């Protein structure tokens, strides 16, 4: 509350005084926190909590999520975004005397990678098998990625664009590639099956392995 005084002085030195009281109402100091940003677009959930304060009086809040959607007078709220983008989130406060304040913060949603890989063979005999794998995973914004290979026999290669493996036993094996972005850790997984065939066991018998040259006739089975 302030008192405004005006003093009028005539040319002859006569004075008069007038006073009036003015009131300056406080506005809220608007602020909010964000739970986590950036987040992967798949399964994203952004949590916002107001930390707005006011010296005296009350206020109401209004949220704008930056994608055209809003929330009313709530202290905390959460929101899911449908597209990969940078969003400006705004919180508005209005005091009970109509004083306005606002704050804006930016959040980001990140694209998911698309895991992919090629191999030199999808099947080999056990003896001398040597499988080689190469990733062709992509992500729309070109963010660097890590690639982890799991060969289906408790062996793996971590953080490599290429995988190479020799199997010690026959069987079908599921090769798994997990590609994840360096920023945000957004992940995609791709499985492919390779087959390792058992080696045949060569064996035969001879009915009589010692015979005279004349008239010899060997039988093999």
Where are these regions (language model features)?
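Extracellular/lumenal mature domains of secreted and surface-exposed proteins
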Residues: 1-221
């Amino acid at each position: 509350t302030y008192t405004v005084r005006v003093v009028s002085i005539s040319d002859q030195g006569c004075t008069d005084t007038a006073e009036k009281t003015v009131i300056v109402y406080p506005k809220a100091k608007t602020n909010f926190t964000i739970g986590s940003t950036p987040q992967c677009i798949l399964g994203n959930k952004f949590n916002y909590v107001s930390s707005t304060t006011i010296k005296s009086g009350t206020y109401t809040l209004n949220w704008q999520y930056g994608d055209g959607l809003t929330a009313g007078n709530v202290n905390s709220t959460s929101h899911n975004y449908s597209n990969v983008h940078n969003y400006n989130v705004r919180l508005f406060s209005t005091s009970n005397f109509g004083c306005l304040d606002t704050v804006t913060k930016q959040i980001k949603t990140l694209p998911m990678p698309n895991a992919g890989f090629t191999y030199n063979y999808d099947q080999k005999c056990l003896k001398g098998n040597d499988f080689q794998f190469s990733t062709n995973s992509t992500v729309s914004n070109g963010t660097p990625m890590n690639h982890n290979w799991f060969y289906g026999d408790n062996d793996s290669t971590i953080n490599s664009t290429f995988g190479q493996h020799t199997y010690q036993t026959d069987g079908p094996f599921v090769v798994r590639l997990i590609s994840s972005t360096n920023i945000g850790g957004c992940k995609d997984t791709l499985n492919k099956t390779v087959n390792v065939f058992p080696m045949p066991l060569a064996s035969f018998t001879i009915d009589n392995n010692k015979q005279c040259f004349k008239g010899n006739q060997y039988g093999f089975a």
